[in-house]
Swiss-Prot record:
Membrane topology per record: Single-pass membrane protein
UniProt-annotated location(s): Plastid, Chloroplast thylakoid membrane
Organism: Euglena gracilis
Descriptive protein name: Photosystem II reaction center protein I
Name of the gene: psbI
Chain ranges passing through the membrane: 1-21
Organism superkingdom: Eukaryota
Keywords (A to Z) from UniProt: Chloroplast, Membrane, Photosynthesis, Photosystem II, Plastid, Reaction center, Thylakoid, Transmembrane, Transmembrane helix
Native organism taxonomy: Eukaryota, Discoba, Euglenozoa, Euglenida, Spirocuta
């Protein structure tokens, strides 16, 4: 029973740490604001008639 408890706690710790490090990552897809705090509209809206950005 102790082994199961340790395994469950370790599994929870792994998932929580993945979640926290995912939030702290500097991925622009997860962080739609640029360095100045302005929303990067190119992430959400790409004009198909304008061509590649």
């Amino acid at each position: 029973m102790l082994i199961l408890k340790v395994f469950v706690y370790a599994l929870i710790l792994i998932f929580v740490s993945l979640f926290v490090f995912g939030l702290l990552s500097n991925d622009p897809g997860r962080n739609p604001y640029d360095d100045t705090g302005e929303l990067m509209r190119e992430v959400f809206y790409k004009d198909p008639y304008k061509g590649p950005l």
